[in-house]
Amino acid sequence: MYLWFFFVTIKKRFAGGFLMKSKKNIILIGMPGAGKSTIGVLLAKSLLMDFADTDLLIQRKHSAALCEIIAAKGIDEFLQIENDVICASEFYNCVVATGGSAVYGEEAMAKLGSEGTVVYLKVGPDELEKRINNIHTRGIAMKEGTSIAQLYEERAPLYEKYADITVDCAALTPEECVDAISDMIK
C-alpha cells in the first residue's frame, strides 16, 4: 500500500475501515483516455467481480455508436440518455466504467455513489492528448471547438466532487493502477 502513497488520495473514510467494506461496486470515473475500460476489466478480473461499461450499455440500448448518437441527438440529449441509462441499470458486485461525461448527471452520480466506491482515474490534459487519437470518432460529449485541455478544466472539479478515491494514473501502467485501487479498497 505504501508504494502507491504518492499516487492515491482518499477523500472519505468510512467507520470500520476502507471504503469497499460498506459498498458493493467500484465505480470508475475520469476523462476519456484515462483508462477506465482497460483498468476496469483488469480490476474486475483481479477482484473476481463483474464488469460493466456504461458507454456499451448506451450503445446497446440505442443500437448506435456514441458518436452517432451525439451527432443525431446533440450533446444535451446524449447527456440525458447517459443519465437515464445509468439510473435504470442495476449493478451488484461490479466494476463499472462510466463514460467521461457521466459526472454531468447528478442523478446518475448520486445513484452510483450510493451503490459503490467512486474512483477517479486522474490523467492530465497533456497525457490525454497523447492517448486520444480518435477524438472525432470516439464519441466524446464535447462542444465543437473545445480542446481536451478545456474539457479537462471543465470536468476535473466534477470528478473531484464525486470521487471517494483519486488515483493519479498518468505515470502508472494499467496493472499498477489496479494494484493501487485494490490496496485502497481492501
Task: Locate predicted features.
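A glycine- and Lys/Arg-enriched "phosphate-lid" helix/loop adjacent to the NTP-binding pocket
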Residues: 114-157
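Conserved lysine of the Walker
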Residues: 36
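P-loop (Walker A) phosphate-binding loop of NTP-binding proteins
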Residues: 31
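Hydrophobic positions on the alpha1 helix immediately C-terminal to the Walker A/P-loop
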Residues: 39
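Hydrophobic anchor at the beta1->P-loop junction of P-loop NTPases
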Residues: 28
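ATP-dependent small-molecule kinase phosphotransfer cores
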Residues: 54-102, 106-111
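NTP-dependent small-molecule kinase module
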Residues: 20-22, 42, 46, 117, ...
